[in-house]
Amino acid sequence: MALLILGPLIGTAAAQSLTYPDLVRRLVDLEHLATLPQAGERTTQWSSYDRRSRIEPATGRFLDWHANADGHGVIRREGNLQVLAEMKGPGVLWRMWSASPKQGRVRIYLDDAPEPAVDLPFLGYFNREHAPFDRPALVHTAARGWNNYTPIPYQTSCKIVAEEGWGDYYHFTYTTFPEGTVVPTFRSELSAEDRSALEELDRLLQQCGPRVPQDSLGRDTFEGILGPGDGHALRRTGPAAITFLRARVEGLTRPADEEALRELVLEITWDDEARPAVWSPLGDFFGTAPGANPYRSLPCGLTEDGWFYAQWYMPFGRSAEVRLLNEGAQPRKVHLEVFTERLRRPPESYGRFHAKWHRDEFLPTEATRELDWPLLKTRGRGRYVGAMLHVWNPRGGWWGEGDEKFFVDGEPFPSTFGTGSEDYFGYAWGCPDLFQHAYHNQTRNDGNNKGHISVNRWHIAEQVPFQESFEAYLEKYFSNGRPTLYAATVYWYLAPGGHDPYAPVPLEHRVGYARAPSYKPIPGAVEGERLKILECSRGRVREQDMSGWGEDWSHDAQLWWTGAQPGDRLDLELVVERTARYRVEARFTRAPDYGIVQLFLNGAKLGHPVDLYAPAVLPFGPVSLGTNALAAGTHVLSVEMAGANPEAAPAYLFGLDYIRLTPLDSQSEDLSTDEPR
């Protein structure tokens, strides 16, 4: 397996010849990431992004820049077929992804051949029922996202067309090699040698984890206690490369680990440069935050015994200094190990590894780009190789609607334009399920996308080369004021002398910002989602997170009744603390598919029927339902589905934000009833 990782070094001359096993090795070749890209080498992506997003040629202005119908965009239609992707060679398709592949056929034509090299239902590229797309590590689902990492090379051209019914959402990520590169034309029936390469790769990817070097140039270690403000540096002279780095912090427990791993900082400086190329809170550097969240991927991870590991290939010329700092108030016992190897190329043929943690750096000022959150901005020659995103989303709701956009070498329109943040990270439909894989991971999700979320994506084969500059953005729909807050660690290689604009971030901006929103209590209100369900004649009753529709619902939630029909009834238990006469009010939700309901209290009608139709999702009320004398104890609040507004979609949904009981004393008692509108 080590031979597959290292492999025979593939030359960097423009006129190179790559076999299929050579291309397979690129999926695990971490050293190749460090080599500086050749002129003419590009990695781009075709996707189903909303084609209304475009650029105005005369002015360069972005138009409909945040259009969001991203499921079915295509290049063009040819008769009954849709052209999904079209590339000139020599190149290789590295990655396919979809949120919902279906039975409509997708055909891949290579090198101007009249017959497709592959002709399958789109689902067939992902369900592992068709060779060679049947290796579980290369072809897999992750939190409802369908991924296929089987390389498909072509010499002169690649065209992907689809019949109707192919599904929803797609990505095709590919690299174009410099002119003169020779690659084989992909065939579904692989040779024995090609099959063997794929099998070995698949086995390796299924066994991701730390590979401690057994025969290295050197091993430098530190074990000790770092007091507040202390640091320790490990220094190595070159030329050489760090190929394995691991760290452990003793005594970490949740939730204290979240702050500790942000207080500890990892810095790496190459060749005595004035500023570190690597600067990150310790935990974030290894691809997960906040806290210690075990996972295993190809370049980095955290093992169950508490060892963080990174096996990025990190070359240097004269020197490398790896420094661990404790900027917190508590002493920390830490372990740090750094392994180096001899270079197998001249130092000048490599870029230097960069990894930087930041929050809200270099936000755009153009009015048309207010949603574009900058992931990375850099200048020079190098390769973008991945990112970890930590989201603090205390109100819940779907945070990741925004697309990724990559601008390479100053291009006016992004050559990578995605379809959603979770799509970029290889999953789909905002699914909160944790997953781990060689190339992408969801290492933390506190539940239903509420609280802390941590995701990463590693561009190993499909790294993005650039000659002059690289800018990456993620659209961010939820504002900081909501609050929904992003923090990212980005990873890239950059030629010496390139521009890395990211400075160290003070401790006060790294910890303490993840604060939950406060809710002003409503006197006498009983939250609908907290009411005990006594009986439901049909359908399903559950709590629904309403934070995605604004901040107007009490505690960002409601009781939600779905699947009802006219005449159905829902009985809820209402607890009254003391005997009194009460004004009864309720706050509901109105929406295009909500019904008309009649409320009852202990079998007696409460007011008139309430029409909950509206053309948009809106809070409604509080609606006065009259006054009632109620004894202390339990009572039955009933909801009867009476029908629907003629304008409403006939789904007969019902949402209750809260019911409020206000006691009336003898001086202020008001027996009048405000009728529902």
Regions found by a protein language model. Give the residues of each.
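Extracytoplasmic
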Residues: V408, H509-S672
